Amino acid sequence: MNAVLVEAIRSKRRLSFVYNEKPRIAEPQCYGIGHKGTELLRIHQLRGGSEPEPLFNVSKIDSLKMLDEHFDKPGPNYKRNDSAMKFIFAQL
């Protein structure tokens, strides 16, 4: 379990990280274990990709930083208890 991801979700703080060699800025929505046992992160993406609320394999995230920027609400398509995850560490 990644404590930075849990804290970022609980405190509604934005993240910066690199994924597939692209820098990203995101609002974390849900973090847990997928049905195949992979740690997954659902985000609302602000910069760095074309999908607004993609799902990321946490093991492929590099240079993870919690920013001193807060957000107020989930992304427009967010649904609690993400069906892609069998166990959830933290969610909005």
Indicate where each model-derived feature is located:
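Core beta-strand-centered patch of the WYL/Sm-like small regulatory domain
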Residues: 1-92
